[in-house]
Amino acid sequence: MDLAQNREHKFVSAVMYLHNDAAYIDMFLSMITQELAALFDKYELIFVNDASSDDGIAKIYDFFEHTKMDSQMVSIIQMSSYQGQEAAMNAGRDLAIGDFVFEFDNLFIDYPKTLIRKIYERTLEGYDVVAAGCRDGMRFTSRMFYSVFNRNSNSEGKIGPETFRILSRRAVNRIKSIGDYIPYRKAIYMNCGLRADVIEYHAIDIDARRKALKGRHERTHLALDSLIYFTDVMEKVSTVISALFVVISLLMGIEIIREFCMKTQAVSGWLSTMGFMSLSFMGVFILLSIIMKYLSVILKLMYRKQRYLIAGVEKIAPKQ
């Protein structure tokens, strides 16, 4: 009775990403159902199956076959093909109807279960986005990416490694108003104009955490796309390269003028050919810098449709 009285009278959603995570499903389901049942009167679980090839979905059905379902709803989104974590989690968030939405990017548990309550209680202090992050075992390339991103991003919110997060309904609505296409959730969440915070923790098992982190090829593409979308790094790089070649062209022009003034014997036609090429390439590189600037502006203004396809949504209903 006391437990029921201590529950929050709110409906929350928990969105979980699935891609060959069968090894972690049983432990995760036991933890998440216990914690959410202790915290809230009603909740829903949304599993986004991103073309898993293992028996993870069967394990989910088996778990709820032997679990009493009196305060939760369970949905499984079947993606039509493998589409990556960002697109899959966008699909799950769009389906969620809770007052608060938890997002779990993977099912591996390397944090104390009390952290779920802790990040929720942080939202009660006025924060609309609260994430749980861990820097233990972070690769050098990840550190470099976050450093470059935060240094070159024009926004105040800084990003870092995150394991899971909670969003208020106001944050979800704000994100939807920003645009239909969310290429990198972490950057959007931390810079949507609402109060955001990160609670850091230390991993229970660093080696196991490193093994559980997957999708390195996908993360590489995501990192490059994010630098293009949210920072001016690529614009700066292209400008530096163009400026370098402009300088080389100018030096070549100076050399041509020097040889002409000193009347140095040269191969017939060499001066005119090199002079034309120097001026031409200098013009090309200047134009490329201007084009890159225009492309950067167009990219920020362009409206993109949501990019994910689902095959269907399955519901796990309680037994009658």
How would you label these PLM feature ranges?
Residues 24-26, 54-63:
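Acidic helix N-cap motif at the loop->helix transition within catalytic regions
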Residues 173-233:
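Catalytic donor/gating beta->alpha subdomain of glycosyltransferases that bind UDP-sugars
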Residues 1-34:
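N-proximal low-complexity "stem/linker" segments adjacent to membrane-targeting elements
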Residues 41-52, 77-79:
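Short beta-strand/loop segment that forms part of the nucleotide-sugar
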Residues 235-316:
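Membrane-embedded multi-pass helical conduit in multi-pass membrane proteins
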Residues 78-96, 114-118:
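Glycine-rich, basic loop-to-helix element that forms the pyrophosphate-binding segment
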Residues 49-58, 108-109:
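A conserved acidic beta->alpha catalytic loop
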Residues 101:
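Short aromatic/hydrophobic "clamp" motif used to bind/position activated sugar donors
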